[in-house]
Amino acid sequence: MKDKISMPLIEAMLQYKSEDVYPLHTPGHKGGRGMQRLLRQELGASVQMDVSLMSELDDIHEPETYIKEAQELAAQTYGSDACFWAVNGTSQAIHAMLLTALNPGEKLLLPRNAHRSVAGGLVLGGIEAVYLQPEYQPEFGIQMQVTVQQIETALAQDSKIKAVLLTSPNYYGVAADVQTIADCCHAHNAVLLVDEAHGPHLGFSELLPPSALQCGADACAQSTHKILGAMTQCSMLQVQGARLDLQRAADVMSILTTTSPNYLLMASLDAARAQVQAYGGEMAAAAVQAAAKLRSLCAAYSGLRVMEAADCGGLQLDTTKVTVNFAAWGYTGVEVGELFREARVAVELVDAYNVLFLVTYADVTTDYDEALARIAAVLDKMQAQKRAPLQLAAAAQVPQTQAVLPLRDVFYRAKRAVPLAQAVGKICGEQVSFYPPGIPVLLPGELVTEEIIAYCQAQKELGLPVSGPADSSLQTIRIIAD
């Protein structure tokens, strides 16, 4: 029965393909006939499924048949009242959450380490941000989650806060206390929005933390492509309850969605939903088991520290995210990531002291076991060449910032570039992040300080890529023109 779960859009696309219709319509490559030879060879028969928006296949802007049914099935699968497909990734879904929940000038309470895409939503919506500093985990040198006490205090002090945004789980798999926070938000008549980019697999097994929807969130943005079987840039926005206007959410999603959505991308969302609907529990178990093999491998090396739930201050951990700290061996995360890449293993994230491996249900093949063997070979070599331990410096923690101007105001202000060292005391005119994880170090409108410059220089020296500024080398930074 599981294999007979409906995939409405895919079934409609296959039906259209079987009719052998000659396409005197877009796209211009005409079912692959005109596509560059090498690309066509690599893509294979799938190019015939790259079809145009037409009534036979439904319209994501006005869904009435196959897309409507597929999105309804996704909502049923996750237990929401409505699901909206996002073909511009979770960034689009986050923007839609903010524009649905808040009007211009209203306040959003959020952690300062929210993903950089949130800043774009604040600009689009003219929303005022009220930031909270997440708790810090000194042994791994990473930011964790904001607490219910912080949120309770902020909501009690400012009745103009209309919504709260969480990132849960965070990049490292640490889940916030979403249920308690949801209760707190609703008691203060605020809606709870969750960036659940790294949690589309939650809610299908007790081996993992519960999902945001199960914990009472009003909406969540999920990266179906990050953890499940959808193609890159495919995500979902889930909405539940009466606190958000579903029609407004639909209108916002339509505004933010291209009028030429790729049907292969949407088909992959349909397929990923069907897969997790049928096998979600088995997929979760497979991922947890595969991650456990990697955890055991790394933990067997003296000095390496693998993040466990006990390191999370009472919060739950998605154990399919495997964070390994190499400070005791004297290696930075960047260096270790490069060593693994030389051994033909690419990791999800590196930072000053850690490497993050992302394990999913797909890591059950002999290829995965071979990758584990290559990881072990690298670790054996590193163990024989251990260095003096690294001291987890305070510089590992992003310095606190001070907002001087609203993001939207800065977006429309004139800016000029100055050498980074000369920007102290100036108002930043652009976003500065190191990606991944894409957490802004500086946001437009914030004051540039010596501490922030020192932090940025330290991250550059580690070799972490800069994201956001016009000058990607960060030799210069744009500030508000005097």
Residue ranges of predicted features:
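N-terminal "arm"/small-domain region of PLP-dependent enzymes with the aminotransferase-like
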Residues: 1-65, 437
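Conserved PLP-enzyme active-site core in the AAT-like
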Residues: 9-14, 20, 38-40, 62, ...
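Conserved N-terminal alpha-helix of the aminotransferase class I/II PLP-enzyme fold
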Residues: 47-90
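Short acidic (Asp/Glu) and glycine-rich catalytic loops that position anionic groups and cofactors
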Residues: 246-250, 268-277, 315-320, 349-355, ...
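Conserved small-domain helix->loop->beta segment predominantly found in fold-type I
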Residues: 282-356, 383-399
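PLP-dependent enzyme catalytic core of the Aspartate aminotransferase-like
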Residues: 342, 348-482
